[in-house]
Amino acid sequence: DVFDRIGVTYEVYGGPGNCCGILQFRVGDAETAGKIATSTIDRFQNSGAPDVVAWCPTCHIHFSEVALPSVSDEGAPPFDMHMLPTYLADRLDQLKPHLTRSVSKRVALFEFPGARGVTEAVRKLMNAVPGVEYVDLGIEHAGYQMSALETVPDYRSKTIAGVLRAAEENNVDVLCSV
């Protein structure tokens, strides 16, 4: 709906048929991961779109840092990859006329800094919503998503508890995970 409102022409790709190959890559099956990623890249390239927008940080990181550089012999990838928040923040002028309802809330982010520019983009988008007050919880950030912390369960548990405590201490109305 948001893309429709700001006049973006798009096609939706998703599911296992459009996978980045990260699951195979993580367990050491680079050959299968490469085939999956290359097949998906070919589908994206054949669409003719200059931009591919991902909502999944793992897909974005894997395509941008591993798969696309591997298939781009001439250096330039066949399209630009964007995370959804950065794509929308880059089009904030088109989006602002649609942000008309005041949302009187104190909002904090449980953010993961691994996907470049995402946290900044989300803050920029939040600040554009009338009535939203961004609250910085002043906490340490690690990983690129909560599942990245599964190998350090004690740290993960302490992080979650710390975020919830900080949100309560700062009288946050909404705690968003990014």
For the regions a language model picked out, list residue spans one by one:
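Iron-sulfur cluster-binding electron-transfer modules in prokaryotic oxidoreductases
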Residues: 1-178
